[in-house]
């Protein structure tokens, strides 16, 4: 538990910042939550720079919420829609489902703004959290005796405040992180991916669809992908029957899409069925008028300052591209892991923060790399016959040797008890086995039935011990 009167400043009232504020308040700390933006729940608030890809919340994110409060998790997730797999749309418009889980597991689509506002409502209901919007962190002094001195810009003036410690949840361009670098030797790197994203919109249908159980034009139980090798379109369902659709492609592609005619030809050639849903004119207007977002990764280490003065969570510590759907899930897991360490060390921030950096780094590096790698999987491998056959075999082994063989996606998305780095290690070992299995299948099949299956099982166990 926090010491009586101990204060924490949480910088950033996004998803991770809100959950961190709720978690610290539950442990007895006096929490101040700051954000440079206006309160997004206000009707007058319009953020033209806010461009978000719909969220896919899975086991790690859900467990992060539950670790703070089971009932809170149920309340803030009431608007999510389960997606049981991908729906692949080929050039001809044919749709092919690909299940996510081995046994019917699903990831869940939820609107970022809806979830953020739900968490802010929870924050507002807490006696020990004070949320202050329109406060932009300008400077921090982490050598100010027993407290940390923060300078905020507020309505053209500066305000100086002091806290026992600081939690930076202010995103990829974190000011908290920049200020921490002034006081410790923090390694830092950022990498822009040669890929932009652009949001599009599939409206709900005018009439209720009996087939889909609502005003949905396409299945709401799938994440839809139009993979076209070096570019792609995706769509995630919303509760109102609409879909948030996002186009991803290399920046150089824009050079070939200058005119309306070029855009029309490109979109109708590559996404004919999607244009029937979005509307060709709407898609062209979006390409011509909407801001294109950049995708970047951030890595740093350590994530904390000595003495328990400050720590980074979420994108401030590990921004990643969205192709594994783990950005928010990983950030919520950050909160759960940190709270567990504070329990383990009886509230000793110095020890808990140091252990967090030491134990969490491998996981964060692993998921950042997995997210980058998964772009090719979504845009290309999902239509590759070789990779589909390999994936099918992987899933067969997973179902046959339940609990012994786990596909990578299962470990990352549905097994919050398996750290990211451990999932990568297991996957590498299984990939080597899978390569041998593919070579051996014909000879094993000749043995037939149960005998072949038993031999395969014994052989896998033997290889896994190597």
From Swiss-Prot:
Family annotation (SUPFAM superfamilies): FAD/NAD(P)-binding domain
Gene3D superfamilies attached to this UniProt entry: FAD/NAD(P)-binding domain
Reactions catalysed, as given in the entry: L-kynurenine + NADPH + O2 + H(+) = 3-hydroxy-L-kynurenine + NADP(+) + H2O
InterPro entries: FAD-bd (IPR002938), FAD/NAD-bd_sf (IPR036188), Kynurenine_monooxygenase (IPR027545)
A Pfam family: FAD_binding_3
Annotated EC: 1.14.13.9
Functional summary from the UniProt entry: Catalyzes the hydroxylation of L-kynurenine (L-Kyn) to form 3-hydroxy-L-kynurenine (L-3OHKyn). Required for synthesis of quinolinic acid.
Protein name: Kynurenine 3-monooxygenase
Organism: Eremothecium gossypii (strain ATCC 10895 / CBS 109.51 / FGSC 9923 / NRRL Y-1056) (Yeast)
Gene that this sequence comes from: BNA4
């Amino acid at each position: 538990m926090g010491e009586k009167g101990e204060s924490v400043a949480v910088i950033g009232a996004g998803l991770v910042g809100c959950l961190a504020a709720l978690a610290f308040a539950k442990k007895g700390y006096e929490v101040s939550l700051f954000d440079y933006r206006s309160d997004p729940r206000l009707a007058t608030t319009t953020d033209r720079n806010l461009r978000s890809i719909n969220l896919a919340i899975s086991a790690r994110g859900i467990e992060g919420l539950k670790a703070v409060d089971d009932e809170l998790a149920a309340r803030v997730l009431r608007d999510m829609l389960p997606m049981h797999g991908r729906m692949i749309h080929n050039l001809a418009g044919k749709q092919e489902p690909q299940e996510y889980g081995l046994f019917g597991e699903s990831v869940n689509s939820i609107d970022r703004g809806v979830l953020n506002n739900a968490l802010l409502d929870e924050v507002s209901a807490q006696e020990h959290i004070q949320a202050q919007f329109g406060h932009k962190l300008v400077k921090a002094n982490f050598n100010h005796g027993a407290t940390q001195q923060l300078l905020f810009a507020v309505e053209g003036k500066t305000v100086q405040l002091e806290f026992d410690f600081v939690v930076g949840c202010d995103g990829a361009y974190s000011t908290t992180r920049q200020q921490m670098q002034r006081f410790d030797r923090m390694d830092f790197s950022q990498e822009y991916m040669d890929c932009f994203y652009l949001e599009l919109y599939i409206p709900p249908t005018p009439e209720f669809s009996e087939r889909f159980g609502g005003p949905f034009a396409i299945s709401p139980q799938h994440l839809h992908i139009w993979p076209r090798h070096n570019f792609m379109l995706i769509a995630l369902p919303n509760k109102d029957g609409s879909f948030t659709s996002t186009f991803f492609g290399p920046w150089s592609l824009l050079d070939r899409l200058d005119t309306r005619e070029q855009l029309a030809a490109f979109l109708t050639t590559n996404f004919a069925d999607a244009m029937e849903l979005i509307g060709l004119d709407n898609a062209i207007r979006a390409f011509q008028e909407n801001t294109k977002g950049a995708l970047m990764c951030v890595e740093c280490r350590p994530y904390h300052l000595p003495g328990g003065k400050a720590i980074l969570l979420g994108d401030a510590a590990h921004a990643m591209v969205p192709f594994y759907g783990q950005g928010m899930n990983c950030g919520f897991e950050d909160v759960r892991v940190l709270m567990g360490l504070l329990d383990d060390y009886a509230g000793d921030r110095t020890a808990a923060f140091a252990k967090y950096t030491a134990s969490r780094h491998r996981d964060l590096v692993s998921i950042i790399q997995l997210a980058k790698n998964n772009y090719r999987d979504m845009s290309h491998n999902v239509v590759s016959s070789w990779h589909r056959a390999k994936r099918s075999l992987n899933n067969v082994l997973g179902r046959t040797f339940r609990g012994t063989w786990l596909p990578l996606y299962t470990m990352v998305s549905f097994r919050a008890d398996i750290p990211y780095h451990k999932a990568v290690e297991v996957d590498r070992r299984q990939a080597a086995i899978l390569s041998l299995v593919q070579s051996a299948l014909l000879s094993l099949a000749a043995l037939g039935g149960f005998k072949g299956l038993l031999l395969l099982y014994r052989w896998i166990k033997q290889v896994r011990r190597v």
